[in-house]
Amino acid sequence: MQNWRDETLKDNVSVDKSFDFAVRIVNLCKFLNNEKKEYILSKQLLRSGTSIGANVSEAQRAQSKADFSSKMAIALKEANETYYWLKLLHKTDYLNESQYNSINADVNDLIGLLTAICKTTNSNK
């Protein structure tokens, strides 16, 4: 049985992409913990990487345009922070080139999408 909320958010690119990205982040953090025995940076990555989708999802039920804009801006900040942690994990050899390139492409895609949403929202004020 599908939830009314799922039906309302159907075909929302930002919701879908940020959720799928959060799943990738959770799986990456499991890998970093289990295979690389890395716990500190991965905890930061888990927090920021899953926060993107949480804020995008929250924005869908914003009480006002200002609330929507604020939540999307927070999601963008979290995406930028996630980019930082991924780059650091790559430069410190916790992520190989292939792993980094794949997930980095996804975070850059999200950053571009969220930037466009924030610009559009701010220009319509």
What are these regions (language model features)?
Residues 1-54, 58, 62-125:
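Short, C-terminally biased terminal segments at protein or domain edges
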